[in-house]
């Protein structure tokens, strides 16, 4: 029996009605403690239990991409470990890679609470966090102390500081990258969060090109750089970004961030505010973005014939969800909202399901499944 799904989650969500952000903070405190006391006998015991319960190793799930070894294709999406306080523990929870951040050059408190809401009827979350984090320098100091101690690739998601005007965005991203470039395995240019005023305008080709230009000029260590896009873009805008990815030799595209659309939601009123989701600012993640993110993955694959790697994220709850994104063209996938709803067993359940899919389709490795929709 999945204790989290049938006991812990109902207790926290329905009976205690714990505030989502408070619950997240308590979770991060616990994971941070585990991550930074790993030399203690008691902590090692807990980590061993986690690894035995939550990790699944199989060579068919391994991939070598952008010069990095991924033990499995399921990663933690950005937004969960904003300051990298638990970076060493994610491998013990079964993840094949983890993306830290979003981090900004200037530390900032984010938007005022309440700013995180569950929409259980829609298997979704609505957030307007606003890139709350302690800043790139603080993350850099923390990761420098732990350098060489990670058993999975660690990505860093970079955002624009709220105090920085849009016309100075390129320098702001560059300042963060300079502090962190030797400490992350790959980097993500986040220009798609709806919760920083004007940020999504940086997805415009002229604005985005200035950011990518300065980053790649600085990128003498040749770290893989991705751009993360919104699900609400028109096809023409996505095609423009694909062109930039080729021009600036990006490692790939992450599809997608949260959506600002509200159509089709079952939730009528958000309990914490008494308002409808349509009245609340913020981005929606989870099941409502599932199909759109997969459509965009499929579009990118078709436009590039699979030449640009894609990390697929949005509405992944089950092995079938993961398989749909991989066969549409995603080399890797990331989870966040689904992990909150499904619990810590979710990663191993998805990996087990993916292995079953490989056997069903008589494939020898997960890499053979990438873009399977388009292979005869």
From Swiss-Prot:
- Pfam families found in the cross-reference section: DHO_dh (PF01180)
Which superkingdom heads the taxonomic lineage of this protein's source?
Bacteria
Which residues of the sequence carry a binding annotation for FMN?
Answer: 78-82, 102, 157, 190, 228, 256, 286, 315, 336-337
Q: What InterPro entries does the entry give? A: Aldolase_TIM (IPR013785), DHO_dehydrogenase (IPR050074), Dihydroorotate_DH_2 (IPR005719), Dihydroorotate_DH_cat (IPR005720), Dihydroorotate_DH_CS (IPR001295)
Catalytic reaction annotation: (S)-dihydroorotate + a quinone = orotate + a quinol
Q: Which GO terms describe its molecular function?
A: dihydroorotate dehydrogenase (quinone) activity
Enzyme class at the top of the EC tree: oxidoreductase
UniProt cofactor note? Binds 1 FMN per subunit.
> Where does the record place the catalytic residues?
193 (nucleophile)
Q: Which family does it belong to?
A: Belongs to the dihydroorotate dehydrogenase family. Type 2 subfamily.
Q: How does it assemble?
A: Monomer.
| Name of this protein | Dihydroorotate dehydrogenase (quinone)
Native species:
Nostoc sp. (strain PCC 7120 / SAG 25.82 / UTEX 2576)
